[in-house]
């Protein structure tokens, strides 16, 4: 299903690469089931309000639509298992992967190599890759601070249409492979509770930027963790408020 190795170097991925980030950031890959709005968000068919201007274009490579892949998986599952796939099954998953900079050519090449490695080692099949260079925040001086990242969409099933069974060890190995292929420092092992989705990461960058300007130095590892913990706590608190409000409205 994955047929992107032959992408011409002069095609859509051949973009000018300005405003490179020189600060080394740690790798992070966060994998979750796709949602109903994943494809529209990733392709920018529905543009979020928080996008910021970028001199480097996004990359969108789609081998197949999510809906079509799911239909193929469901058909294969019925043929091999003899019954319909459960509605709560998550055969298609999506990774949000932090990128070190906005070098589209290099990042795309590394992402494709990572996809090949994941397919060979675990049977994970990527069928969409989206590189986003237009998210981040504008600081107090009007300068753009970008959150470069990619969304990769996977067929997370075996040749019988059954979901792949990967445990903590395999998921940790995927974190390591991501760091190696993207040529980034690996995120700390066991720090899953401090990982942020890309929306939370945007807020983290904004807070981090302001504090470093106030302190006139880079934040320590301890200070960095404290920011992440606070963001996660606030996110959980907001979710709880939403749940309580919905109960009251009933």
Q: What are the roles of these predicted feature ranges?
A:
Residues 1-250:
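N-terminal nicking endonuclease/strand-transfer module with a His-rich metal-binding environment
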